[in-house]
Amino acid sequence: MKRVILLSILLFTAGVIRSELASATEVGTSRQFGLGVQLFEPTAFIGKLFLDRNDAIDFGVGFWGYGRCYNNNGPYACSNGNQYFSLHFDYLYEEPIVDTVVRLDWHVGAGGRMAFNSYYNGDGRHDAALFARVPIGLDLTFRRPHWLEAYLEIAPGLWILPPLAFDIDVGLGVRAYF
């Protein structure tokens, strides 16, 4: 009897998961998971997973050697060739604007970014910074090829660690969907 109950629970759970994944693709699009690249701040390899028609998770891993440096005084402009590593993760809500020859969506979300310096800055340790951000952007999906998306995103936010400071991330990128 316990095996029957356990098997029923497992089958029910698998059915719910399958229907949730299917709902992301049954809304008139075959895209659910995309990978790509983003230029500017942060320059990154990026991914996006649709949870349903309007909700998605966006993430990225970036490396760069220009732009902003981070220390105990907050972000500052630099061009000294130091290398930085960045991780970002956002929840996005999307709505279509145009859905004709191309599909144009706008999105807004909430998330964060961590940046790590890879150099010694004189204070006895490598620095890390934490950024709370609100990404706002446009996503352009082509009908042919239907698996390609281009986007522009602006993400104003606050550096929480080190000391509080306002900053804006700007990204221009492309994704291929599978």
Where are these regions (language model features)?
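Cleavable N-terminal export/targeting peptides
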Residues: 1-28
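Transmembrane beta-strand segments of Gram-negative outer membrane beta-barrel proteins
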Residues: 29-39, 106-112
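Solvent-exposed loop/turn segments connecting transmembrane beta-strands
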Residues: 33-49, 63-69, 81-83, 158-167
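Outer-membrane beta-barrel pore domains and translocons
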Residues: 38-40, 62-64, 111-115, 153-159, ...
